Amino acid sequence: MASLKDVQNQIVSIKKTKQITKAMNMVASAKLRGAQDRIERFRPYADKFYEMLGDLAAGADSSVHPLLEVHEEIKTVGIVLTTSDRGLCGSFNANMINAALKKAAEKKAEGKAVKFYCVGKKGAAAIKKTEYEIVEAYNDDMTHFDFNLAASIGNKVIDAYLAEELDEVFLVFGEFVNVASQPPNTLQILPMSSDAAGEEGESGANSEYIYEPSVEGLLAELLPRFVKVQVYRGLLDTSCSEHAARMAAMDNASRACDDMTETLTLLYNKTRQAAITADLMDIVGGAEALKG
């Protein structure tokens, strides 16, 4: 049985750990509010952008812009994987990595090569241990990022697609549904898929709008930006999801600390009671021996 001092030291250690987890929970909560504010401010712009672009693309032939064209042969697939730079966020990073590897395995089974663009240290570290090539790794960028990061990633995959170094590009990100749900999402961003278009785009060109100078000219300007907007929205979602997952993980850790403290306190009391009982037995035994 552990000594009283050992049990007491464990209780003190666990209480200190709880102080850390509670502080991390509060920090994650504050960061989540900031990330939610960013994504809520960006969503109206993104939604209207998708609606307009979907309408334009539906009313135009795919040959008007190379980013709309499906390559005749799909030989190489690019996957943009977004994860966090830091851990302590439960199974969040593992879920993102597993979703990306699942898509990679599907494409490999079809005889296609797979290349990765990793945003976040955790994703890059995991993919390095696999057979897949990492074209670009963006480390320490998920902590503080802006649209410039999305533009940089977007430009690289666009250049690779136009040069036919990539034939399809997928984005894997954590879709922020709410504080309790952040499922991984895999979205095709190149070539532009019908899923990315708004409901207006799915039904064809909107005859109420007159586009100047031309649909083709607008698509040439908007399609590259569409890719960057998609990437940026994925980064925002992943950032929100990371903070929500870390907040939940730290809350669970704090609860576990409470349970362990309760268990160890009970053990401490039992150990102390046993020690007192043993001392009393020694005293009684000594007294009886003196009487005899």
Swiss-Prot record:
InterPro entries cross-referenced by the UniProt entry: ATP_synth_F1_ATPase_gsu (IPR035968), ATP_synth_F1_gsu (IPR000131)
GO cellular component terms listed in the entry, alphabetical order: plasma membrane; proton-transporting ATP synthase complex
Subcellular location: Cell inner membrane
Gene3D superfamilies in the cross-refs: 3.40.1380.10, ATP synthase, gamma subunit, helix hairpin domain
Keyword Transport appears in the UniProt entry: yes
Pfam family, one: ATP-synt
GO MF, one annotated term: proton-transporting ATP synthase activity, rotational mechanism
Keyword terms: ATP synthesis, Cell inner membrane, Cell membrane, CF(1), Hydrogen ion transport, Ion transport, Membrane, Transport
CDD domains for the chain: F1-ATPase_gamma
Coiled coil: none
Topology within the bilayer: Peripheral membrane protein
UniProt GO BP: proton motive force-driven plasma membrane ATP synthesis
Subunit note: F-type ATPases have 2 components, CF(1) - the catalytic core - and CF(0) - the membrane proton channel. CF(1) has five subunits: alpha(3), beta(3), gamma(1), delta(1), epsilon(1). CF(0) has three main subunits: a, b and c.
NCBIfam families, alphabetized: ATPsyn_F1gamma (TIGR01146), PRK13424.1 (NF009957)
UniProt record similarity statement: Belongs to the ATPase gamma chain family.
Role description: Produces ATP from ADP in the presence of a proton gradient across the membrane. The gamma chain is believed to be important in regulating ATPase activity and the flow of protons through the CF(0) complex.
Protein name in UniProt: ATP synthase gamma chain
Organism name: Maridesulfovibrio salexigens (strain ATCC 14822 / DSM 2638 / NCIMB 8403 / VKM B-1763) (Desulfovibrio salexigens)
